[in-house]
């Protein structure tokens, strides 16, 4: 069983207008990193989705490297190609902007979106409802659109309502 806590993990006390989701990275393959997206709620830690990102690299390679461990603000990005495609795909007013991970040193335009393999990431975080291992073959996550639609409504509305959303990346791999 995967232990989602380390002794050194801080327990954050969030204000009523603050929300933090966490990516627990648990497996690094040659081309991808698999994780679990979760959130602490009133009933304990809640599973939200599986995740897939690019692999860890000591030196960043553009669009081929996962972002560093840390906590970052998430805001809505209402411009760019992804925003335009998702506005058409999911429709307005449902789509309010891309979930955009902010102020990552050395990275820009880190989004949370749909996809299945490291070919779809370019450094971004993909979410899905299923996952296969990435040790003996390339990592794959499935039912990505279903997971994205389930998560997006709640997270985007939280931001639209003027609340603070953060995401914490934790390396267990």
Region annotations inferred by a language model:
Residues 2-165, 170-173:
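Cell wall/extracellular polymer interaction/catalysis modules
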């Amino acid at each position: 069983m995967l232990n989602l806590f380390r002794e050194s993990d801080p327990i954050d006390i969030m204000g009523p207008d603050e929300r933090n989701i966490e990516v627990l990275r648990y497996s690094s393959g040659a081309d991808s990193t698999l994780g679990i997206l979760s959130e602490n709620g009133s009933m304990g830690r809640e599973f939200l989705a599986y995740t897939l990102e690019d692999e860890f690299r000591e030196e960043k390679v553009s669009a081929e490297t996962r972002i560093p461990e840390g906590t970052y603000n998430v805001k809505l990005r209402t411009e760019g190609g992804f925003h335009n495609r998702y506005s058409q795909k999911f429709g307005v007013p449902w789509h309010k902007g891309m979930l955009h991970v902010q102020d990552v040193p050395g990275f820009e335009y880190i989004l949370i979106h749909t996809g299945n393999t490291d070919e779809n990431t370019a450094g971004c975080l993909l979410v899905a409802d299923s996952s296969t291992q990435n040790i003996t073959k390339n990592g794959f996550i499935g039912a990505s659109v279903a997971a994205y639609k389930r998560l997006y409504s709640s997270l985007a509305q939280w931001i639209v309502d003027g609340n603070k959303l953060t995401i914490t990346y934790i390396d267990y791999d």
